[in-house]
UniProtKB/Swiss-Prot annotation:
The keyword Repeat applies. Keywords: Cytoplasm, Repeat, WD repeat. It comes from Homo sapiens (Human). PROSITE patterns: WD_REPEATS_2, WD_REPEATS_REGION. InterPro entries: CUL4-DDB1_E3_ligase_receptor (IPR052254), WD40/YVTN_repeat-like_dom_sf (IPR015943), WD40_repeat_dom_sf (IPR036322), WD40_rpt (IPR001680). This is DDB1- and CUL4-associated factor 4-like protein 1. Gene3D superfamilies: YVTN repeat-like/Quinoprotein amine dehydrogenase (2.130.10.10). GO terms for cellular component: Cul4-RING E3 ubiquitin ligase complex; cytoplasm. WD repeats lie at residues 268-307, 312-351. Its main location: cytoplasm. Pfam families: Beta-prop_DCAF4. Transmembrane segments: none annotated. It comes from the Eukaryota. It is found in: Cytoplasm.
Amino acid sequence: MEAERLRLLEEEAKLKKVARMGFNASSMLRKSQLGFLNVTSYSRLANELRVSCMERKKVQIRSLDPSSLASDRFNFILASTNSDQLFVVNQVEVEGSKYGIISLRTLKIPSFHVYVLRNLYVPNRKVKSLCWASLNQLDSHVLLCFEGITDAPSCAVLLPASRFLSVHTRVNQPGMLCSFQIPEAWSCAWSLNTRAYHCFSAGLSQQVLLTSVATGHQQSFDTSSDVLAQQFASTAPLLFNGCRSGEIFAIDLRCRNRGKGWRATRLFHDSAVTSVQILQEEQCLMASDMTGKIKLWDLRATKCVRQYEGHVNESAYLPLHVHEEEGIVVAVGQDCYTRIWSLHDAHLLRTIPSPYSASEDDIPSVAFASRLGGIRGAAPGLLMAVRQDLYCFPFS
């Protein structure tokens, strides 16, 4: 495996030259105009060209705070909706974690540097799940689900993103800090659905817990398995859940009676479902599991219509990233390889090796930015965090 990783790293250095030999945008456009390429083939080849031309760039991390993240290992990164910031979880040498926000506004070609804003250190508490939350405005908060310890029960905390801004820029942005006592959560999701406005869901052991931030009211739905992945639909009144048993089911948010009628859709994988992603039209759902299967499901016909081969997972909780604008699917495997597929035909476009030897402790965390730095007109790009390093793979 190590020899394969080194071979791919060597090939990566030559990618730009290789990709341009007889395989460029102008020749593909000409073939399409002459009818030699249909729309599907043209789209796939265009994506393959852009993805194959992505070059790894080391990002310089600068700090506005003396307690810099630069010396701490990255555990997880999560891009905001507008791709202008990353929420990061870092492992520190003493027991506990650091949480912070990295501003991506300075991440531009050819200068690749970012700024770490203020950090918060939480000793002896581990986050089981997290997501962005839109309470006052888009991505105004981060929802963190902490596991319980001896003198502190498990809870869900809505942390204002403004808490991470410097003192000078935090004026008139107090934000609201909320805490809710809940059982330990495997997963969480924030709702933008009008049927569950200002609500979040927590996937628990054999239960889904829906909580209203405004009133504190909680509604539970009993399940037969641990809920490892969740996502609310934006328009349909549904909350999709992926379970350890391999079942994917939707909760109809219009049903107040927990006893019957709330289970709207049922799909099945052969292993624990670790990620669910609803596509924009809400007619399809993509899911990945602990056997490395990635499937695209037609929600109307309740059947699998496409599989994406090559992903490696045996026991890890690994997210799936779907980006419809670019027509790609991204996933990091337990073997530490980042793979990119064409969303439309499941063709494997690229396999990116980790800069470090494969290890359970060094699985990269990735995020895809539709506009690097959140700047209008900026190129999309892939961000990768591994150990203490942050890398960027901008689209050409």
